[in-house]
Amino acid sequence: MQIPLLTPQKDPMGAAIADYFANGKASKLRVFSSMFDEDEIPVKQLFRNFTEMPALEQEALRMSEGRILDVGAGSGCHSLALQEMGKTVKAIDISPLSVEVMLKRGVKDACLENFFNEQFSGSFDTILMLMNGSGIVEKIANLPIFFHTLKRLLAPGGCVWM
């Protein structure tokens, strides 16, 4: 399964993140998919700090240990919270606009990367896929490659938080 890196012209989420970061305003991001119902996300929600996150996300961040991979990191809110806790995190996203914003916001290790890229390597004690992180699977037929990729990147005894 090869998910291409996005171009700015085909990156509405990255554009919304960049606009909100630059101007402090963006209304809602509408998400359409044949796999689930239409959804709306207030862009401001992507810029939450730790105390504004739901209890379940807070607990996942607290329980994250060792070398952490934040998949589909978006604006970097989870990575920033982890850094503030003194944890080591690598944030990846297929959106160049999102990665640029993460770096400007202070995420120390943010890179433009496709989770499914066989050349992407590393050994992570925790893999985070919060919010709609499992959406990268796209369809049931992609579950085997998804689990293969998790197994390849997850250190022995590691955990995945979704």
Where are each of the predicted segments found?
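Conserved SAM/SAH-binding loop
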Residues: S75
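Short alpha-helix immediately C-terminal to the canonical SAM-binding loop
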Residues: V99-E100
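Conserved SAM-binding strand-loop segment of SAM-dependent methyltransferases
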Residues: G106-N117
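A short SAM/SAH-binding and catalytic strip from SAM-dependent methyltransferases
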Residues: F124-P144
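N-terminal auxiliary segments of SAM/dcSAM-dependent transferases
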Residues: M1-R30
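Conserved SAM/SAH-binding beta-strand->alpha-helix loop
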Residues: S95-P96
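A short glycine-rich, Lys/Arg-flanked "PGG" loop and its adjoining helix->strand segment in the class I
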Residues: N142-P156
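Conserved alpha-helix/loop element of class I SAM-dependent methyltransferases that forms part
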Residues: F47-R67
